[in-house]
Amino acid sequence: MTVIDLVRQFAEDARTGVLVTDTDFSAAGPKILYANPAIGPLTGHSHTSLIGRSPKALQGKATSPFTRKAMGEALRAGRGFHTCLTNYRADGEAYLCEIDIRPLRNDEGEVEAFIAFERAVERRRVRARPGKNTRYRPVDPATEDEAVNEFSDFRPFQSPLD
């Protein structure tokens, strides 16, 4: 059983978008090896049409170059990365996306692929607090209800953003 087969077993019917990419960090960027169906409503692309493309295809003018650079550095070093950034849907609409990327390592500890958990978030307007700008709340794109972390044991979104 391959890594993709294992991920497919738990992610195929998940409401959170899941991507698996290779580790090629050439100029074109890593290639998507697997995308679950939940990525479709999030990005406006069918999950099958994303296979073989780079996640960079979802980025655009308002995607922070600083965040892209920091993400690339972390992934090239074999570390995970968690952030909110602006991505773009197939129709060109910008949306705020929370992404939690983790390396998938083999028995020798080498990174074989990366898995990314993605979800749209909305800004919640609140009074600013020292050290905090804005709080974010995950949103289920199908219902606009507050999303529930389906991978609670794995906790891919546990961070100061929660």
Task: Specify the residue positions occupied by each region the protein language model found.
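PAS and PAS-like sensory/regulatory domains
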Residues: 16, 81-83, 90, 95-99, ...
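Short loop/turn elements at sensory-signaling interfaces that couple input to output
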Residues: 99-114, 119-129
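Terminal output helix/cap of sensory domains in signal transduction proteins
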Residues: 61-86, 91-93, 148-153
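Short hydrophobic secondary-structure edge segments in sensory/regulatory modules of signaling proteins
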Residues: 18-22
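Conserved hydrophobic beta-strand signature of PAS-family and PAS-like sensory domains
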Residues: 29-33
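PAS-family sensory/regulatory domains
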Residues: 49-62
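PAS-family sensory domains
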Residues: 23-25, 86-92, 105-107
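PAS/PAS-like sensory domain cap-loop motif
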Residues: 39-50
